[in-house]
């Protein structure tokens, strides 16, 4: 279920390794970035740019920067405090970029603004992290040999951390003998999602592993292993918007469970139903 997505992701984002005697420098600042500079280092954006540039990363508006990545959630003033630099919008929320505030934008919306806009939904970053996680000798999903993700030494603990997921993907267990449906959410302010959960749960119990509609008595720590123990996963977005597709549907595919999805009306453009 997930392997074709992984292959398509690797093939759609080839980064030819260019040999530099000295890679050109790139000063990047981050503003209003969840988790700050350390989280930015884990992102797909940093991974891509680091193949071409020697990056200096900071969060200080008084230091020079070639570009600043951020989003206006919280305070646009932080973005404006960076002077003489190109501002790049990036968001994980259902939010339209303000091109009066930003020079460039990366987001969910299906729009064409020439070289000022790139559609790269949040699920793309999730695919990046999934690709990193399966660079492991025990993972049921395999990376192509020429992938940049194979440049690092592989780990050896995926199966230990995901025994049920590996068994299902490797046809070592019966997928029809799994539980009915799973649900993991942390945001209670999603009335359509909550209403659907109640309706489905009234027909057959849906196991909740997050802080919303929890049925376990604790929040699951390993989401993918949890999802893999059920036939279906209720993976509704918080809100609806054309192009707004987050990591939720990727988590379902990765866990070899069938997604019950609501969110972007155009989701079939991203994933073949």
Where are these regions (language model features)?
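Nucleotide-sugar donor-binding catalytic core of glycosyltransferases
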Residues: 4-273
